[in-house]
Amino acid sequence: IPVLPKPLAEVVTNAYLLCRLADTIEDDVALSNQQKSEFHRRFVSVVEGSDNAESFSSALAPLLSSSVLPDEYDLVTNAAKIVRITHGFSIKEQEALIRCITLMCSGMPGFQHNKSLKGLRGLDELGAYCYVVAGVVGEMLTELFCVHCPELRGKRDEMMRLAVSFGQGLQMTNILKDIWDDRQAGTCWLPRSVFVDSDFELEQLDKLYGTEVFKIGIKKLISVSHRHLRD
């Protein structure tokens, strides 16, 4: 962000804060799935301008876990200031931000609410997960770049495709890097379909991580991730 031209840096910084706020809702351990869905819905309405940011913050802040990071708590309590800046951007900039937040807040809960040590079904589901947490951000950034750099507009369609692919590569890298941390949190984002042995179960990964089946599956995921990053 610091290397971007100032007008673009301002809107990208604001977009980052909006995404962080959406993540804060999703990651808070004290909120039920129903509460998360409701606050995600309200947050989208706040960003769109059809709900009051102060009432949103006042309702959400007292419900956050005592373990929430101070910076994340400040994001929630200062949502009105953040969104006020959002609403000062151009229509096209606001449209890009609203689309990203809407897709993220509507897509993340389905995965988060069903997360378990069983992992995802296959590569298609993994791709869908990567899209709602990373691909939509890449699309938003592409739209903003095209707004601020008119010479890029002729390449927009190709850049949008590459943004989704690169986002998946980055998210898959995070998934592979965080396998054991995610497992401690009761989560696994690995796709079951790449582990071809019918007896291999991701729930038993602490016992099976040294098997050839696991090694082959991980190598395949690394290859897929690398291909997306090379795009």
Residue ranges: model-predicted function:
Residues 1-230:
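Acidic catalytic motifs of isoprenoid enzymes
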